[in-house]
Amino acid sequence: MNINSTLFLQAVVFAILVWFTMKFVWPPITKALDERAQKIADGLAAADKAKSELSSANKRVEAELATSRTETATRLADADRRGQGIIEDAKARAVEEANKIIAAAQAEAAQQSVKAREALREQVALLAVKGAEQILRKEVNAGVHADLLSRLKTEL
């Protein structure tokens, strides 16, 4: 074989190889590469979508946290106000009860003072009668002199 025919024959074989490769080998390879590229693009799109969903979920969570914080602060303030009101009511009731107890004690003390004065008046009247009896050296009849004794009690 001659170099020219060999070269021509090799060029024909090479052309057949290129045609065979382009017809039967190249399409499955390009199809596989295209599918792989599509999967990668879908994965990146899903990652971007998940990232945006995560961002929006984080924003919703932050909004909910802010809402719950303000609600908690409001409830704590309400509870504190109610607690202060209950304490003030209890103090007012305690002061009122103390005033009632003091008034009752003062009334009882005044009543006992009146009773003690009456008892002392009667004792003084008896002592005065006994003293007068001893001075006069004779017995004074309480029934006969009841008017005199009652006037003496009122004067004392």
Curated annotation (Swiss-Prot):
It is a single-pass membrane protein. It comes from the Bacteria. The chain crosses the membrane at residues 7-27. One of its GO terms (cellular component) is proton-transporting ATP synthase complex. Keywords: ATP synthesis, Cell inner membrane, Cell membrane, CF(0), Hydrogen ion transport, Ion transport, Membrane, Transmembrane, Transmembrane helix, Transport. Its main location: membrane. One of its GO terms (molecular function) is proton-transporting ATPase activity, rotational mechanism. Gene3D superfamilies: 6.10.250.1580. It is found in: Cell inner membrane. InterPro entries: ATP_synth_B-like_membr_sf, ATP_synth_b/b'su_bac/chlpt, ATP_synth_F0_bsu_bac, ATP_synthase_B_chain. NCBIfam families: ATP_synt_b, PRK05759.1-2. Belongs to the ATPase B chain family. F(1)F(0) ATP synthase produces ATP from ADP in the presence of a proton or sodium gradient. F-type ATPases consist of two structural domains, F(1) containing the extramembraneous catalytic core and F(0) containing the membrane proton channel, linked together by a central stalk and a peripheral stalk. During catalysis, ATP synthesis in the catalytic domain of F(1) is coupled via a rotary mechanism of the central stalk subunits to proton translocation. Component of the F(0) channel, it forms part of the peripheral stalk, linking F(1) to F(0). F-type ATPases have 2 components, F(1) - the catalytic core - and F(0) - the membrane proton channel. F(1) has five subunits: alpha(3), beta(3), gamma(1), delta(1), epsilon(1). F(0) has three main subunits: a(1), b(2) and c(10-14). The alpha and beta chains form an alternating ring which encloses part of the gamma chain. F(1) is attached to F(0) by a central stalk formed by the gamma and epsilon chains, while a peripheral stalk is formed by the delta and b chains. This is ATP synthase subunit b.
